[in-house]
Structure formats: C-alpha cells, structure tokens
Amino acid sequence: MEGDGGTPWALALLRTFDAGEFTGWEKVGSGGFGQVYKVRHVHWKTWLAIKCSPSLHVDDRERMELLEEAKKMEMAKFRYILPVYGICREPVGLVMEYMETGSLEKLLASEPLPWDLRFRIIHETAVGMNFLHCMAPPLLHLDLKPANILLDAHYHVKISDFGLAKCNGLSHSHDLSMDGLFGTIAYLPPERIREKSRLFDTKHDVYSFAIVIWGVLTQKKPFADEKNILHIMVKVVKGHRPELPPVCRARPRACSHLIRLMQRCWQGDPRVRPTFQGNGLNGELIRQVLAALLPVTGRWRSPGEGFRLESEVIIRVTCPLSSPQEITSETEDLCEKPDDEVKETAHDLDVKSPPEPRSEVVPARLKRASAPTFDNDYSLSELLSQLDSGVSQAVEGPEELSRSSSESKLPSSGSGKRLSGVSSVDSAFSSRGSLSLSFEREPSTSDLGTTDVQKKKLVDAIVSGDTSKLMKILQPQDVDLALDSGASLLHLAVEAGQEECAKWLLLNNANPNLSNRRGSTPLHMAVERRVRGVVELLLARKISVNAKDEDQWTALHFAAQNGDESSTRLLLEKNASVNEVDFEGRTPMHVACQHGQENIVRILLRRGVDVSLQGKDAWLPLHYAAWQGHLPIVKLLAKQPGVSVNAQTLDGRTPLHLAAQRGHYRVARILIDLCSDVNVCSLLAQTPLHVAAETGHTSTARLLLHRGAGKEAMTSDGYTALHLAARNGHLATVKLLVEEKADVLARGPLNQTALHLAAAHGHSEVVEELVSADVIDLFDEQGLSALHLAAQGRHAQTVETLLRHGAHINLQSLKFQGGHGPAATLLRRSKT
C-alpha cells in the first residue's frame, strides 16, 4: 500500500509494507545500525531483507532518518548499489533485496578467495562509488567498509548502508554516532578525526576505499591487533596505515599496481588523493583501477584518448551521467550486447603466471555493429559489461572472436539459452543492470550439443588456470558437471593444480564429496598432491573426511604416506578416524611406519593411536617399520607401553625376522638391545639367523651369532643356516658360518650336506670353501655325491673344482659322459 504524500511515510516511488506481508522472520545480523532480518514476502514468493531500527520505539526523528536513507538508496539506483523496495510500518524498517552471500566482511573472514574474485570486488566497489560521486551533487557514503559491501549469490558487489550518506559539503564530523564506531574508525580518514568542523568531500570515501583494498588483498581486518579506539585514531592521525605484509607468495602482478593505488588513496593530505569522478576518463581513480586490473601490456594514451591494448583497440569511457537517461541506456546496452560477445584477450590476468602472447586471439581490427573501425567510443556501462566478469577482459569483435584459441576447432554451439548465472528467483528482484543476458543462436546440424560445448569450455578454463574465464562461463547447473572421465570439475581443478579455480568452484557450492571412477574425492586428490590451500577450503565445508577410494584409502592415509604434517593435523582436527583400514588392513599409522614418516607417527601417537592394532596377517606398525628399516620409528614404537618387540605376524615372524631378512643391521641391533629373542622361530621354524643366512646379509648374521643365535638350529624342512647360505651361493655368509664352527657335515633334506646343495646349484666358489677330504665324496640318500649333482646340473666350473680337489669318478658319474655339455667333456677327460 502506498503512503500518502502529506504523511511522514511519503516515499515517492517507494512502497510502504505492513508486517503481515512478510513471514519467516530470521535474524541474520545486528549491530549499531540495528537488526537485519531475512523475511519472505507472502505474495512475491521471494526473500527480502528488513533493516530495523535499534530502538524498540521509533520516534519521528528516527523515522525521518530511515526515510532519508531509503530515498538516498532509491535515488542511487545502480547495478552495484543495493536495491531498496520501501519501508515496513511496524516494526519500522527498511525493506531491501536480500543478499544471499552476506557482507564482504563475512566472506573475507571465511576462506581464501580467488584472486580474480578479489580484483572483481575491488573493481565493482570502485564503479559503485564512482556512480555515487557522479551524482549532482555527489552523494558521499561516509561509511564505506567491508561490512557495508554486500554480495549477491554470484558474488557481485552491492554497496549498502547509506545511514551516514550526505550530499557533498552538507555534513559535519559531529554527525558521526558512536554506535558502531569501533568497526568504522579504521576506515575514517585522518582529517575527519582531526578537524571537527571540516566539510566532507569525496576524498573521505577515497580513503575508506583504500582501506577496503587493503582488506580485500590481505583478507584481514585493519589494525586488528589494536583493541583501543583512541590508539587507532592517534595512529591514523600520525600517518600510520595498516602494515603491508607480503600479500601472497604467488600473487598476481596486478597486486603491485593495486598496492600503489591504495597508497595514493590513503595519503594524509586529501588534496593528493585521486578521485572517483572526473572528466573524459571517468575520473582518475576509476582509470587507475582499470589500469591496475587490465592486462599489463596495455597502456593509457593521452587524456581523452582512452586505454590502448596491444591489439590497437582503444577504449574510451564517458561519465555515466552524461545524460539523464544513462541508467536506462545502460540496461538497454546490456540487453543489446550478449555475454557471448564479451571475449577474453590473450593477456587476461593469470593468477599463476603471465600468459604467453597469442596473436591469433587479439586481432588488429575490431568489428562492431555494421561498420568496421579502429577506434570505438565506449560508455562506462559498456566498459563495465566487458570487465565485470573477469576484470581483466578486453573488448573484441563479436562472432569471429567468440572462441578462445583452444576452442577454435570446436563447431559453434547449438541452440539453447544460457543463464547469466542468476537464478529465476533472484533475477526477479535484482537491481537494474545487474543481469547479463545472452541470446539464442541458430542451430546447426553439425554443431556439438550445448552441454558438450559448455563442458569443453569449462575444462579448458580450468586446465589453463583461467579463473576469470571460469567466473564468466560457470553456470549454477554446471558446478557438479560430470566429465567423461567420471570426475567433477572440482576433481579436475585439484588434479591440474589450479587452486584459484578450485576456490571459485567451492564458492559456488561445488559438492566436495563427489567421487570419480576410482572412488577418490577432491579431498583425496588435494591431500595426495599436497595442495594445502584446497585442503583447508574443503575441510571448511561439510565433507566426509573418512571417505574411501577404491583401495579403501582415506585422505589421512595419503597424508600419512606423504609425511604431510599440515594436512594430517587439519584432518585430525576434523575428526578423521585414525583406525580406518585399507584393503590390506593398514591404518594411517601402518602407512606412516611403512613409509618412514616419523613426524606423522609422533602426531598419531600424541593422539593416542593404538600401536598394537593389527593389520592384514597380524602385521603391527612395528613390523612395517622394521621391514622398511626405519630406525627412528622402530626406536619410537618399541619403547611405547604395551608394545612387544617379539610380536609375531600370522606366519610367526617377529620384527627381528623382518629386519634380518632385509639386512637392516642397525634395526636388528636396536631390537636385540631391546631384548628381542634371537632364537624365536616362525611357523616354518626359521630363526632370524636362518633368514639372514638365506638372504646373504652377513653383517646381520654375524650380529645374531655374537648375540647367541643357534648355529645348528634347523627349519621345519631340516635346513641349518649353513645349508641355506650354501644353497643360495652367499660366499661371505658361508665363510662366516665356517669360521664360527658351523657343522659342515650336518645333513639336511635328502640327507644332503651344505656341499651337496652348493654343487647342485653350481656355486663353485662356495664349493671351493666347503670342499674337504671328509665331505667331497659323501653320498646323499639317493647315492649321489657332490660331483654327481654338479654334473647332473651341467655346472662345468663346479665339476672342475671338485675334480681338482680329487673328487672320485664312479659309474654314476660315467653315465653323464654321453652328454655334449662342458661337464660331460670334463668327466670323459678325467676318466681318460
């Protein structure tokens, strides 16, 4: 219902609402300005926001202040200004468009943002303030700060809270209320603090804008460590500004330009600060923002000529209020210029590294409408339509430039409408000029489907790390698009190492729990590739930290394998299970021990992980550490309460068996020092000495012998350590055992001695060591001597060694004379 013109509710074109028109009141914010409620309009079927007065009882003065704020917001209708619909009678409040994302202050504190989004926010804020300052007279905001910069569902800026806004020169310092001063003081220029009677001008907002730039680049609050308002005021007046730490190790080059601009904007002398508004080039500050965010290869020409890109395209911008119809014409301009005609140049800002020039993408001529021309005049609104999606995009021709070089081989897309990124519900109440429209194209029978074309564009943007392009083309329905490989776009971004693209996908609510064909979630991939920034972003969402891939590995398994201490701590803070097992029964502790990640083992031990938890075949973490020879971990685990150094696997092997088998001398020594039994037997009755002798680890065998290992112990098959060393040809180990008085006459399977085994396998050097008058002609249970076995195996060198030492040739040996090998030849010669 409309208010009467003569009442305090006279609102011109604004509407007056009753409380009964709203339902579902939900408080979403509060402060010195009052309370903000999210409400649903009964008839409009959409969500709105109502900013109510902080007072329970609103007098006429407060009511008039609220009306004045509403009128100022109505007067300042612009794409980057928060739309206002009217006043609610009771409770008294300002009815505005609901911003789903909330304030910039909240967003900056929530998670790291993509650089392209940060640049776009700075750019859109500058354009919104430029609009206010271009009004006649200029409208001063006077309270510009992240809390008063709202963001819609697609992260576009809407400047709000005009409670302090005044027309140029009509307000004094004493108008500032102490309500909410603490959140505002860091954004106040020094002249406002110092000069009580000073008339305000546009330079006030310029200073505040500089602090906003600092906050967006650093994602911190200015003077956050200072808790006293007076101390902040003294610092600002004395010329202190927020510190400039390295914004980011891999920050884009545009940061340097913005930092220089920011430092100019927060100068103590307001006269040397740049301005938003101006003549010809739309104001010095807008020009500086564009210069910082447009490709660094471009340059400004002389005043009035515009910005020259490398392609010789010249962009001229004019004051947005050069005619009273400019807002309407801007909306019409957007409708006349589809999104598909906004193209990326070869020098778009790349957050990772400077892109290489691609001359085929940036033509020397620009076609617009029907007449080709080199120099085109563009209004500010046209320029903004080119820049608002990627900040670093330039103006190119329409049809022939509609694809990037990586997409030029694709057929043109088929028919079908592409949404602008605004849902149907949101678009009904979006401010004028905030929608970017695209038009249908004529279908072609040879064209790829729209989905396939869009999918390829998204893949190309992510793989190339073109975040600005991704921000432009990503539609809400495409966020969880399944690729041909079964992966999602988020999988692709993580796999390609494109952290900025992953940030944008997550900001657009990409599902972090989707799995690819291997069962891996983006968290698996991010942890495996040690992309810490993405890991932090993923864990900040509702995510299944214990999701398993096809091998039953969780993200914590990957962190343990890589020794990624940071990811391990983050996962444990999110209650990742330390007892999840993979297909081999290994927990993250088992994996960390297997891969020698002592730092992870210590973290898990501090978390109270049970080190006696058995994996497949009853392997403990200590078994894995001993098997791989990770001495520090063996020491650490062996000293844990309740750990037995003689713990056996399913086949009866102890950690000492495993260390001896792999020849880890130092591990074996520390285990023995910690009272490991050197004579413990496995299920095959093998002692650690048997294992060391069989694998030829002489130093470990010597250690075991000196620590009391039995030389004559036999396995379940009847082998001694000497038998095993001789059979496998380990000469050094055989010498050691002989020196240690091992029985060379001991009989094993088939009643064979160590010499029989060495001869049968052709180990001539071992035969040389073992041969003696006592054993050279001994027979096994089959009646074969060492010479018979060597000849049977056709080991000529071994036969020669035995013959040289006087081995006896008998009928059994002669049956091999009919052969043609070297062994048979030797036997025939010896017989002759």
From Swiss-Prot:
InterPro entries named among the record's database cross-references: Ankyrin_rpt, Ankyrin_rpt-contain_sf, Kinase-like_dom_sf, Prot_kinase_dom, Protein_kinase_ATP_BS, Ser/Thr_kinase_AS
Binding of ATP, residues: V28, G29, S30, G31, G32, F33, G34, Q35, V36, K51
Compositionally biased region (Basic and acidic residues): 343-359
MF (Gene Ontology): ATP binding; protein serine kinase activity; protein serine/threonine kinase activity
Recorded superkingdom: Eukaryota
Entries under Pfam families matching the protein: Ank_2, Ank_4, Pkinase
Residue spans of the ANK repeats: 485-514, 518-547, 551-580, 584-613, 617-647, 651-680, 684-713, 717-746, 750-780, 782-811
Location of this chain's protein in the cell: Cytoplasm; Membrane
Record location of the Glycyl lysine isopeptide (Lys-Gly) (interchain with G-Cter in ubiquitin) cross-link: K51, K145
Topological type in the membrane: Peripheral membrane protein
Listed SUPFAM superfamilies: Ankyrin repeat, Protein kinase-like (PK-like)
Entry keywords, A to Z: ANK repeat, ATP-binding, Cytoplasm, Disease variant, Ectodermal dysplasia, Isopeptide bond, Kinase, Membrane, Nucleotide-binding, Phosphoprotein, Receptor, Repeat, Serine/threonine-protein kinase, Transferase, Ubl conjugation
Leader peptide range in chain numbering: none
Catalytic activity: L-seryl-[protein] + ATP = O-phospho-L-seryl-[protein] + ADP + H(+); L-threonyl-[protein] + ATP = O-phospho-L-threonyl-[protein] + ADP + H(+)
Disordered as annotated region, ranges: 325-368, 389-424
Post-translational modification: May be phosphorylated by MAP3K2 and MAP3K3. Proteolytically cleaved by during Fas-induced apoptosis. Cleavage at Asp-388 and Asp-426.
Assembly description: Interacts with PRKCB. Interacts with TRAF1, TRAF2, TRAF3 and TRAF5. Interacts with BIRC2/c-IAP1, BIRC3/c-IAP2 and XIAP/BIRC4.
Disease: Bartsocas-Papas syndrome: An autosomal recessive disorder characterized by multiple popliteal pterygia leading to severe arthrogryposis, ankyloblepharon filiforme adnatum, filiform bands between the jaws, synostosis of the carpal/tarsal and phalangeal bones in the hands and feet, digital hypoplasia/aplasia, complete soft-tissue syndactyly, lack of nails, lack of scalp hair, eyebrows and eyelashes, blepharophimosis, cleft lip and/or palate, and hypoplastic external genitalia. Early lethality is common, although survival into childhood and beyond has been reported.
Protein name listed in UniProt: Receptor-interacting serine/threonine-protein kinase 4
Species for this entry: Homo sapiens (Human)
Designated gene of the protein: RIPK4
